[in-house]
Amino acid sequence: MEYDEKLVRFRQAHLNPFNKQLGPRHHEQEPSEKVTSEDTLPELPAGEPEFHYSERMMDLGLSEDHFSRPVGLFLASDVQQLRQAIEECKQVILELPEQSEKQKDAVVRLIHLRLKLQELKDPNEEEPNIRVLLEHRFYKEKSKSVKQTCDKCNTIIWGLIQTWYTCTGCCYRCHSKCLNLISKPCVSSKVSHQAEYELNICPETGLDSQDYRCAECRAPISLRGVPSEARQCDYTGQYYCSHCHWNDLAVIPARVVHNWDFEPRKVSRCSMRYLALMVSRPVLRLREINPLLFNYVEELVEIRKLRQDILLMKPYFITCKEAMEARLLLQLQDRQHFVENDEMYSIQDLLEVHMGRLSCSLTEIHTLFAKHIKLDCERCQAKGFVCELCKEGDVLFPFDSHTSVCNDCSAVFHRDCYYDNSTTCPKCARLTLRKQSLFQEPGLDMDA
C-alpha cells in the first residue's frame, strides 16, 4: 500500500503542467486506477516525496510559489511549452506588487525562459545584418549588455534576448519586430550642405492645423491628455504624442542667433536627431541673420578677427613646402570652414564661443601659424613686406595687428603711416604710371 501511494505521487509530479483541462481533482487517482506492476518506475527517495514536482513546476514558471527556490534547469524542450510558460510568467509579473522582490525575481525568471526559447529557435531564422528601409540603413547590433530604448515602441531593448538594429545615419534604434512599423524616413537625408535651420522661434500654428493628431505618427492627441498627451516641440512648434516626444532637451538654433540663448528646450525625437546631425554643419551666416549680435558679444568679434588672420596666412602655407609636410592646416581639420571663409558658423562653434573654449583654442592655432611664418620658415619670411611710406626695416605681414592692407594691390603698410598718407598707396600709384606709359609709347611711335 505504501508503494502504491508513492507511485501515485510520482505520476502526479510528472503530469504535463500545461494541460489546463486537467484540474487538480482530475489528477487524483481513483482507487480503481491503480497502476499495475507492468509499469516499472524508479523508487522515490525516502523523506523527499514531493521534491521533483515542485522543482519541475518551478522551472517552468508555473508553480504556486514561484520564489521559494532559485531558478533551476529548464526541463521543457518544446518551443510551444516555453512560450506558454513565458505568458504565464508575464501574467504573474503583472499581478505582483510593483518594485517588490518577488516581481524582480519573476522578471529574472522571464529572462531565463526567453533565453531558453531563443536557444531552441531554428538557426535559419537569423536576422540579416543590414536592413534598408525609408532611407534608413539599419545594422544589426551585436552588443548584448548595453541597455537601450526602442525609438518606435518606447520600450526597453533586451539585447540578450532580442534582435535590434541601429541606423548608421540618424542613430535610430528599434527592435527587429518594429522595423516594418517605421513610417518616417531617415533625417540624415535632409542633412546636407544646403540644409537649413528653422530660424523662427517656436513657430506654433496650433493643434487644429494638425487636425489634433501627432505631427509624426498621426495618433490622436489633446492638450488635456485624452486620449494622449500633446507635447510641443520647441524647435518645430508642432505637437507630438508621448511616443514621438520623450521630453528630450536640445539647444534651439533660432534662440541662439536671435537672443544668444543657449538654454536647452524640449524637442521631439525627430527634431533631436536632426539637430544632433546638424550641430557641426556651418550653415549660419550670422552677419546676414543678426548683424547686431557682434555688437553685444565681444567674443564673436575676436573670433572673426582670428578667422580673418588665418585666411591671410593660408596662402603662405599652400606655397610653403615645409608647411605642407608639417600639415599645419590640419590643425583646423575639425573646422574646415575656418580656412574657407570667415562668415559661416555652426551651432557647435557658437556653443564653444559661449563656453569660452573656441577663443582659446583658435588663439593657440593662430600663434602656431604666425610662429612658422615669422620665425621658423625663411621662405615665408621672405614673402613679407616693407612699409614703402616710412621705409623702416621691420618686415610686415598682412595678419599683423598694427598693419593695414591695400584693397587693390594687397601691399602692407604700418597702419599709422597708411592713414597719415590719406590711405594713398604708393605701389598702386606706381603701377598706374607704368600702365599709362605703356599706352603712350605706341602712340608716340605712330606720330614719328
UniProtKB/Swiss-Prot annotation:
Coiled coil: none annotated. Residues 18-46 are annotated as: Disordered. The modification Phosphoserine is found at S437. It comes from the Eukaryota. Abundantly expressed in peripheral blood leukocytes. Highly expressed in B-cells. Also present in lymph node and appendix. Down-regulated upon macrophage/granulocyte differentiation. Weakly expressed in bone marrow and spleen. Weakly or not expressed in thymus and fetal liver. One of its GO terms (biological process) is positive regulation of ruffle assembly. A zinc finger (Phorbol-ester/DAG-type) spans 135-186, 365-425. The keyword Transmembrane does not apply. Keywords: Metal-binding, Phosphoprotein, Repeat, Zinc, Zinc-finger. Pfam families: C1_1 (PF00130), RH_dom (PF13901). InterPro entries: C1-like_sf, DEF8, DEF8_C1, PE/DAG-bd, RH_dom. Residues 25-37 have a biased composition (Basic and acidic residues). GO terms for molecular function: zinc ion binding. Positively regulates lysosome peripheral distribution and ruffled border formation in osteoclasts. Involved in bone resorption. Interacts (via C-terminus) with PLEKHM1; this interaction is weak but increased in a RAB7A-dependent manner. Belongs to the DEF8 family. PANTHER family: DIFFERENTIALLY EXPRESSED IN FDCP 8 HOMOLOG, PLECKSTRIN HOMOLOGY DOMAIN CONTAINING PROTEIN. This is Differentially expressed in FDCP 8. It comes from Mus musculus. The gene is Def8.
